[in-house]
């Protein structure tokens, strides 16, 4: 049986009086590609950010590789090394070259030698199709290139799972495809991925599972076929009618 990598139990998150997550229960298996869809304000990004504790849950548990990471006794930094994150706005350091951005965490947090870190960074640049950009600065790159660099940076720590928070929504339409192509290659390689996105074609083609969220709850969780073609849930139908 495939190992459960992330287990979420009765997760609640409130900002003041606004309850954004209302008792989420979810399991993510090793090697799965899980895509989370839903209308704006449904809690998708908050759920993703709660998985690696960028947002602290108000109540409930996040269990990662068998360890309750919401328990303050456990080492959050060690866990974060195993959970990569790719943000909507890239979050690259503008005063560092591409290769410095990619090697910063492996050198600083894993204690890797510069030589080892740079060798892997160059391999990752090949993987994301930007082998000649090692010495470039982020501002000289297009949005699509910056997001591919951000993905390479996420992979540099050799994480067990990569979380993507709307990785294409800040991009011009012509750049979306190049980022999705890199993500598709990662999915084929067996990388565990949890992706919040509005790209329904990608969800349909690449996901093992699609989760539809609305109003802070998981409305439906199933295969792409179950969600996109066989849903019996009215809220899912209404959402898909608007976006497809």
Predicted regions and their residues:
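ABC family nucleotide-binding domain
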Residues: 3-224
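C-terminal boundary and immediately downstream tail of ABC-type ATPase nucleotide-binding domains
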Residues: 214-215, 221, 225-244
């Amino acid at each position: 049986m495939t190992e459960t990598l992330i287990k979420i139990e009765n997760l609640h998150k409130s900002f003041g009086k606004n309850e954004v997550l209302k008792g989420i229960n979810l399991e993510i298996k090793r090697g799965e590609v899980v895509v989370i869809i839903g209308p704006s304000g449904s809690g998708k990004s908050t759920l993703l950010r709660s998985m690696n504790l960028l947002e602290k849950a108000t109540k409930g548990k996040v269990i990662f590789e068998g360890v309750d990471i919401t328990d303050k006794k456990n080492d959050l930094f060690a866990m974060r090394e195993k959970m990569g994150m790719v943000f909507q706005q890239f979050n690259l350091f503008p005063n560092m070259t591409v290769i410095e951005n990619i090697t910063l965490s492996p050198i600083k947090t894993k204690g890797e030698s510069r030589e080892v870190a740079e060798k892997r960074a160059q391999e990752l640049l090949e993987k994301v199709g930007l082998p000649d950009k090692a010495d470039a600065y982020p501002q000289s790159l297009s949005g699509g290139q910056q997001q591919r660099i951000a993905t390479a940076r996420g992979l540099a720590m050799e994480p067990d799972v990569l979380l993507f928070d709307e990785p294409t929504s800040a991009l011009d339409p012509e750049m979306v495809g190049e980022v999705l192509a890199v993500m598709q290659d990662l999915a084929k390689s067996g990388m565990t991925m949890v992706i919040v996105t509005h790209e329904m074609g990608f969800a349909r083609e690449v996901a093992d599972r699609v989760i539809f969220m609305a109003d802070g709850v998981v409305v439906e969780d199933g295969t792409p076929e179950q969600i996109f073609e066989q849903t019996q849930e009215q809220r899912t139908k209404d959402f898909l009618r608007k976006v497809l």
